[in-house]
Amino acid sequence: MRQIVSTFLFVTVVSGTIIVVSSENWFIIWVGLELSTLALVPILCSGFSPRNVEADNKYFLVQASSAALLLNGALGQAWLTGSWSILDPVNEVTSICLSIALAFKIGLAPVHFWFPDVLQGLPFFQGLIIATWQKIAPLILMFYFSQLGFSYLLITPSLISVLIGGWGGLNQTQVRKILAFSSIGNMGWLVITSAYSFNAAIIMLVIYLIINTSLFLLFDHLKVSTLGHLNTISQLSPISVALVLLVMLSLGGLPPLTGFILKFTSLYFLVANNFIILSSIMIIGNLQDYFFYLRISFNTSLFLFPQHIISSASWRNSTIISPLAPKAWLSSVSTVLSTLAIPLTLPLYIIT
């Protein structure tokens, strides 16, 4: 793909998200979501491999179906109220339709089935886009939607997402599918928090974006596809693999890493609103995340046999990317923030 074409498509993807976030009209929101999706489809299909094309087609079909459902819900809302404004009271039937459409777009259970397969068929950089940037607009809409009094529609899907995110990752050996189920679980944490604090949900979303950006870029740098490959790479680039393990533990919410704030914030608001049983179930779901993240760490770092290096170790430099590359800067900054940013996040709770 030519540079000017890819630049135009990326600008269109960003513009679509900005249109959605800044608009109060349901029709303009639908246009922004479709603009972003249609511009992303050629980007996802840039590899032209059969697996890549299959994942691209699945993504397009799911997004087109959810967009049609969203437009039907918006049309029903406009027919009932005579206005396309998102600020008008929402009917319960149209709210269910809109909630399902937004859940499809972010991969929230029980309509999450497409996300692991799509992410498995894409390169890490394209997977980073659909796991982070493409979820910003639907998530913010869902955050706002939960503030309108329809949070009860989102609590059960969020709880199921947390449990499925833990169960689904237990028996996986493919790195992309582990990232996909982890993303599904984190979507549950974000959405359930938005029912009680919009500002806290936005802070958690920023933390989620930073951690996932770091993890995807590190895996893209190491060219790792399976956990067995990660064990092999650990002997070639031990520092990079150590950073991967730290960021994964941060994504699981292990203190004192940055991801702990994401889980602590959600539990704080749930306990403050006397949802003790719900909090306990979500903790159980997150313990499953801890299990397979720690299992990966043990298998990679603690259970390796000693290796006697006979030749020079200069070949390790082949895995080091140029410090002037944009990915290097983005990966470095996001990795530091993913592991050491707790002191920076604590003052933000003043606004919540």
From Swiss-Prot:
Protein's name in the database: NADH-ubiquinone oxidoreductase chain 2
TM segment ranges: 4-24, 26-46, 67-87, 96-116, 124-144, 148-168, 177-197, 198-218, 241-261, 264-284, 290-310, 332-352
PANTHER family noted in UniProt: NADH-UBIQUINONE OXIDOREDUCTASE CHAIN 2
Cross-referenced InterPro entries: Complex_I_Subunit_2, NADH_DH_su2_C, NADH_UbQ_OxRdtase_chain2, ND/Mrp_TM
Annotated keywords: Electron transport, Membrane, Mitochondrion, Mitochondrion inner membrane, NAD, Respiratory chain, Translocase, Transmembrane, Transmembrane helix, Transport, Ubiquinone
Lineage: Eukaryota, Metazoa, Echinodermata, Eleutherozoa, Echinozoa
Job description of the protein: Core subunit of the mitochondrial membrane respiratory chain NADH dehydrogenase (Complex I) that is believed to belong to the minimal assembly required for catalysis. Complex I functions in the transfer of electrons from NADH to the respiratory chain. The immediate electron acceptor for the enzyme is believed to be ubiquinone.
Membrane topology: Multi-pass membrane protein
Species per Swiss-Prot/TrEMBL record: Strongylocentrotus purpuratus
Entry EC number(s): 7.1.1.2
Keyword Transmembrane helix: yes
One cellular component term from this protein's GO annotations in UniProt: mitochondrial inner membrane
Subcellular location: Mitochondrion inner membrane
Catalyzed reactions: a ubiquinone + NADH + 5 H(+)(in) = a ubiquinol + NAD(+) + 4 H(+)(out)
Tree of life domain: Eukaryota
Subcellular location, principal: mitochondrion
An annotated Gene Ontology molecular function: NADH dehydrogenase (ubiquinone) activity
Protein family according to the UniProt entry: Belongs to the complex I subunit 2 family.
Pfam families: NADH_dehy_S2_C, Proton_antipo_M
